[in-house]
């Protein structure tokens, strides 16, 4: 009698399906969801977000709510705007923390909120929006992009 080979255990991936108008149907692995214990300013009840990359809008990415997938915020790396940007000493480990700034797009142009960045802890899949106490950064840093009236 021959012994059976040892069972191979493969981890099961937990996947969520999100239906969005902007990006269509998105399949998201749980491990790619960032938990925001305090939500975002003005959206404290929303605690889970993903980052969506869309090659049509690079370098802009989208912070998309898992609970309300119709809600997404345009974000980008602040280092593309200011290479010397610093969200503070608590977040200086660039291997662990990734800051993103929320963009506001209007008919007058586009601005970035450098004063209240999103900081992603990529090791623990956590996120938070912080407020930098210094007056060094603006909530409406101009991007120099004029919004087109045609789409």
Set out the residue ranges of the language-model regions.
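Hydrophobic N-terminal alpha-helices or hydrophobic patches in metabolic proteins across all domains
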Residues: 1-151
């Amino acid at each position: 009698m021959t012994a059976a080979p040892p069972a191979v255990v493969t981890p099961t991936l937990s996947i969520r399906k999100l239906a969005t108008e902007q990006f269509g149907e998105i399949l998201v692995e749980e491990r790619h969801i960032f938990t925001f214990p305090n939500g975002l300013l003005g959206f404290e009840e929303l605690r889970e977000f993903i980052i969506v990359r869309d090659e049509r809008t690079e370098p802009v990415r989208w912070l998309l709510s898992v609970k309300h997938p119709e809600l997404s915020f345009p974000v980008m790396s602040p280092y593309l705007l200011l290479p010397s940007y610093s969200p503070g000493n608590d977040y200086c480990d660039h291997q662990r923390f990734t800051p993103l700034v929320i963009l506001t797009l209007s008919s007058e142009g586009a601005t970035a909120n450098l004063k209240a960045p999103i900081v992603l802890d990529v090791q623990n899949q956590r996120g938070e929006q912080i407020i930098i106490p210094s007056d060094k950064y603006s909530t409406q840093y101009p991007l120099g992009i004029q919004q087109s009236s045609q789409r």
